[in-house]
Amino acid sequence: WSQYLEVGIGPDAEIFTKSPVLSAVGPGAKVGVHPMSTWSNPEPEAVMVVNARGRIVGATLGNDVNLRDVEGRSALLLGRAKDNNASCALGPLIRLFDGGFTLE
């Protein structure tokens, strides 16, 4: 946490969203790694599916590729380390929450 504290970001949990439209890819698509990185690693994620009205309508799995060497240069580069074209594979299915959601 020291690098985050140096730039004024506290140790609280954060919700992170992918911004570039092209960052997410579907099943079977090639996952992209930025050419400026030599050290990337996958991060399994639980992904909420949101409709155009902003309502959570389902969930899927994601494999979010993080550029560790870019992130390590500065906490201010976290966005660049996470937001890259084709850096988040989603699927292969979406569990819709039509009738409510339980863990069973």
Question: For each predicted feature, which ranges?
Answer:
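Active-site microenvironments in enzyme catalytic cores
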Residues: 1-104
